[in-house]
Amino acid sequence: MKTLPKEKRYETLSYLPPLSDQQIARQVQYMMDQGYIPGIEFEKDPTPELHHWTLWKLPLFNASSAQEVLNEVRECRSEYSDCYIRVVGFDNIKQCQTVSFIVYKPNQTRY
């Protein structure tokens, strides 16, 4: 029986193979279509009981396309290549984070 390599899983989408830029853009566009405000966070060790994620810049209040968010993800990835990076969606009516998914893992492999 063939099994997947052992690696930490953090969120629902982390059970899928790593997302391509096009797949990330589609997820971000869906999030924006729902009215959520995108933000980018990063963390070296994303274990929930140990750390909080650090917000990359401010949430992208004026983002009008998924490409703008992807550009920020790339910029964050180039500066913090040793960190996990995720995209989050904030609901300004409920005033909470409603969506999040990891878009980059350090030493990421495709299987």
From Swiss-Prot:
SUPFAM superfamilies xrefs: RuBisCO, small subunit (SSF55239)
Keyword RNA-binding: no
Compartment list: Carboxysome
Stretches assigned to coiled coil: none
One GO cellular component term noted in the UniProt record for this chain: carboxysome
Main location: other
Disulfide bonds listed in the record: none
CDD domains named among the record's database cross-references: RuBisCO_small
Keywords: Bacterial microcompartment, Calvin cycle, Carbon dioxide fixation, Carboxysome, Photorespiration, Photosynthesis
GO function terms (MF aspect): ribulose-bisphosphate carboxylase activity
InterPro entries: RuBisCO_ssu, RuBisCO_ssu_dom, RuBisCO_ssu_sf
Protein's GO biological process: photorespiration; reductive pentose-phosphate cycle
Keyword Phosphoprotein among UniProt keywords: no
Regions crossing the membrane: none
Miscellaneous information on this protein: RuBisCO folding and assembly commences when the nascent large subunit folds with the help of the chaperonin GroEL-GroES. Requires homodimeric RuBisCO chaperone RbcX2 to assemble into RbcL8 octamers, making RbcL8-(RbcX2)8. The exposed C-terminus of RbcL binds in a cleft in RbcX2. RbcX2 is displaced by RbcS; as RbcX2 is removed RbcS mediates the ordering of an internal RbcL loop (Thr-63-Leu-69) in a catalytically active conformation. Interacts with accumulation factor Raf1; dimeric Raf1 acts after chaperonin GroEL-GroES, binding to RbcL(2) leading to an RbcL8-Raf1(8) complex. The basic functional RuBisCO is composed of a large chain homodimer in a 'head-to-tail' conformation. In form I RuBisCO this homodimer is arranged in a barrel-like tetramer with the small subunits forming a tetrameric 'cap' on each end of the 'barrel'.
Quaternary structure annotation from Swiss-Prot or TrEMBL: Heterohexadecamer of 8 large and 8 small subunits.
Family the entry assigns: Belongs to the RuBisCO small chain family.
Described purpose of this protein according to its UniProt entry: RuBisCO catalyzes two reactions: the carboxylation of D-ribulose 1,5-bisphosphate, the primary event in carbon dioxide fixation, as well as the oxidative fragmentation of the pentose substrate in the photorespiration process. Both reactions occur simultaneously and in competition at the same active site. Although the small subunit is not catalytic it is essential for maximal activity.
Matches recorded under HAMAP family: RuBisCO_S_bact (MF_00859)
Stated name of the protein: Ribulose bisphosphate carboxylase small subunit
Organism listed in the record: Picosynechococcus sp. (strain ATCC 27264 / PCC 7002 / PR-6)
